[in-house]
């Protein structure tokens, strides 16, 4: 994500010397602890050393986690160019990781959190944790999407979980989620928690079987989540469009032939309530995962154009 970062940090009012940088996840460290568990910022204006490191902000990992943390997904960047009503320069960044955490970074000129507490550039805080471990397989490999809720007027982040390297895994205990999480402090930056004290799934409404909106999160709730059945996993980042978040989902095959392709679904969910609106897509619905069946194979990120949904599939399609 490319943007201009304040050269003098908190409180900087002079923007002429702001620096163009690229912010990205630290990558995939696989088995090496501490490699890739960060937000990496690249200086795009260093002519003497092109592509030089501007800053690496380490993400605090969970000591109790059995997952080697990394950040393979792209960050969500909020700047005055991408959102209305913002008075700061620079940006706020949200980044998910394999441990199932969402970390918020302050890369703006904000100097106060609105409550009288000092804010510094490069500050970070853990917004949410989904409680991932190797048993439940709730890795966050993919990026998130974000929108301002039409009803709540708050920033919502959408994410999904699943072991993308072992997409056909049907080991007992695997249980993945579709998630809608709100940041009630946006557009400010506030120190919330370290990973061990961050809000978790218990602060969210379980809207798994809700098709009426009866389980819509209240103001005090952190958001909503949907439990995927039959070892299903998300296969790309969600896409939010006109009040609905669309998730590409893969359900492993139930065939005795483990080389058979599993089923690809699009789960359409109300962005603020977590209500399952997949039936509105006009496709046949899955038996247990009540999402719109697309075909057999793995779906890409869903793209919207002209009120239509588009996606690639690595298999057989059955969609009009």
Across the structure, where does each feature detected by a protein language model lie?
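Beta-propeller fold recognition
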Residues: 1-320
